[in-house]
C-alpha cells in the first residue's frame, strides 16, 4: 500500500482529516526550507506538498510568486528540489510527499528521468497545474506505470462532462481548488464548496482534499469538516515572508514562526 492511501485510510479509521502544507522548495534558502519541511510531521502535518519553483507561475498569486522568486534567487533548481525530498526521507519514510508545479521544468529536466528520480528519492504524487488532462498522456502514463500518483485538479468551473473525464484517470486523491483565479487571493464559501464536493463524491471513491484560499485555523476546520483533508499554502508562505530580515533572508524567528502557525491550524483541526 502506498503512503498516500495508507495515510488517508489511517486518518479515516481514526475519524480525522488530513492536513497538508504547501511550501516552495528553497524558500527562503535551501537549509531553512529543509529544516521546516523535516519538522512538519511532528507539528501535526499529514502530508507535504513541495512546490517546484518556476519563473512564470501563472496559477499562483503574489505570495507564491514571490516565494518562487526567493527560491530561484537562492539557487534552487528542480534537481535540488528532488534532493530535498531525498533528505526528508532520511528522517521520515512515512509521510506522503507530493511535488506540485509546472510542466516546463519537468520537460526540460526530462520526463522519464524526472519520474525515475522522484520515485527513487521518495516522492509519492505529482500535481502539474498547467497540464490539462487532454495533454498529459505521456507524463501520466509513465507516472502511473511506475506507481507515482497523478493527482488531478478540479475547479469550481469544471463541468460534469469534463469532471467525469478528469476523474477517470485520477489517483492518490482529488485536489479541489476552492476558488476561481490565482492562489491566496480570496476565500471560498463553505456552502458552495460543499455542494461541489457532493457532486464529485458521486463519481469517485478517492479522498477529496480542498486547497487554495484556506488562510486561518477556523477556515481549515470548516473546510476539513466537508472533505477528507485540506492544504494550506499561501498563509504559511506569508508567515515565512513576514519573518525575513531586510535582505529577504531567514531570521532567527523564521522556522519557529512558521511551525507555530502550522501547529495552530493542526490543533484547531484536532480540537485541541
Place the predicted regions along the sequence by residue:
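Active-site-adjacent beta->alpha loops and helix N-cap segments on the catalytic face
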Residues: 1-11, 56-66, 76-88, 106-113, ...
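Catalytic cores of alpha/beta
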Residues: 30-40, 158-168, 210, 214-230
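Conserved N-terminal beta1-alpha1 strand-loop-helix module at the mouth
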Residues: 1-94, 108-111, 168, 251-257, ...
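Glycine-rich phosphate-binding active-site loops on the catalytic face of alpha/beta enzymes
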Residues: 45-56, 125-127, 176-184, 213, ...
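Alpha-helix-loop-beta-strand connector modules within alpha/beta enzyme cores
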Residues: 63-98, 141-151, 155, 192-208, ...
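Alpha/beta catalytic cores of nucleotide-metabolism and tRNA/nucleoside-modifying enzymes
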Residues: 198-204, 215-272
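Hydrophobic faces of well-ordered beta-strands that scaffold small-molecule active sites
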Residues: 19-23, 48-50, 97-101, 126-128, ...
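Active-site/ligand-binding-proximal alpha/beta "capping" segment
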Residues: 113-116, 175-180, 184-229
Amino acid at each position: 500500500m502506498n503512503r498516500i492511501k495508507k495515510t488517508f485510510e489511517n486518518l479515516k479509521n481514526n475519524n480525522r482529516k488530513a492536513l497538508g502544507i504547501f511550501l516552495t522548495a528553497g524558500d527562503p534558502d535551501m537549509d531553512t526550507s529543509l529544516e521546516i519541511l523535516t519538522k512538519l510531521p511532528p507539528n501535526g502535518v499529514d502530508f507535504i506538498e513541495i512546490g517546484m519553483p518556476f519563473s512564470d507561475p501563472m496559477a499562483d498569486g503574489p505570495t507564491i510568486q514571490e516565494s518562487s522568486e526567493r527560491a530561484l534567487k537562492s539557487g534552487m533548481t528542480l534537481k535540488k528540489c528532488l534532493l530535498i525530498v531525498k533528505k526528508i526521507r532520511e528522517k521520515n519514510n512515512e509521510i506522503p510527499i507530493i511535488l506540485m508545479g509546472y510542466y516546463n521544468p519537468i520537460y526540460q529536466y526530462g520526463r522519464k528521468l524526472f519520474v525515475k528520480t522522484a520515485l527513487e528519492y521518495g516522492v509519492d504524487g505529482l500535481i502539474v497545474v498547467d497540464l490539462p488532462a487532454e495533454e498529459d498522456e505521456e507524463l501520466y502514463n509513465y507516472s502511473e506505470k511506475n506507481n507515482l500518483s497523478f493527482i488531478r485538479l478540479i475547479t469550481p468551473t469544471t463541468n460534469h462532462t469534463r469532471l467525469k473525464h478528469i476523474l477517470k484517470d485520477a489517483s492518490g486523491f482529488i485536489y479541489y481548488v476552492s476558488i476561481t483565479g490565482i492562489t491566496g487571493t480570496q476565500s471560498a464559501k463553505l456552502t458552495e464548496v460543499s455542494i461541489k464536493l457532493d457532486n464529485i463524491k458521486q463519481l469517485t471513491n478517492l479522498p477529496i482534499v480542498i486547497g487554495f484560499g484556506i488562510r486561518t485555523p477556523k477556515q481549515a476546520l470548516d473546510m476539513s469538516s466537508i472533505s477528507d483533508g485540506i492544504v494550506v499554502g499561501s498563509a504559511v508562505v506569508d508567515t515565512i515572508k513576514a519573518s525575513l530580515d531586510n535582505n529577504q533572508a531567514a531570521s532567527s524567528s523564521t522556522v519557529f514562526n512558521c511551525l507555530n502557525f502550522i501547529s495552530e491550524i493542526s490543533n484547531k483541526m484536532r480540537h485541541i
